[in-house]
Amino acid sequence: MLIGSLVELAWGEIDSEPIIAKIASEEIKIISLTITEGGYKVDFNQSRSVFWYVAEGLKRRMEKDLPITILSCDNMQMNGNVARCAFMSYFEAKYPEVAAWAKKKVTFPNSMVDRITPVTKPGKVTDVCCEDFIQWVIEDNFIAGRPAWEKVGVTFTHDVTPYEIMKLSLLNASHTLLSYPAYMEGFRKVDAVMADERYRA
């Protein structure tokens, strides 16, 4: 499958300017993030973190008063709230003028992403395996507008909480229930368990 949404790549370790300029660009309305749970831990001494790149871009947006949405796509409950807390704490400590502006001009919608993708092994970074099922639920809180993603299956809602509770109660709980007896029998991967007719039944 070709992922056609990737049209440009910038490597900040080599040159930070293209990333900052893109964040500052008037055509950009949404910054989407997938930085894992650990990525939201703010290290105020780290010179080039995701928080720094975004803050530098927002400084320029602030000059033209261009609002923007920061959309966390990480697998955490209330990920938008987590993102808001992390970014705002960084802004308040390092960029107080950006913090004051962002309170009114930046939104952080919560989202729930559900599609299992196993950890990529060394030497196989080009292979991305995933299950067939996919669900993406997003709080409809986009200050600068958004694409019509509902046309391709995204669910927009005012509150993602019921969807998160459903996922935790039905999906995560059933995975856990399946894992215990399978592990006792020597299974170490869920796909191998599901290939066993006794468990699949």
Task: Map each language-model feature to its residues.
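Substrate/ligand-engaging "lid" and interaction regions
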Residues: M1-A201
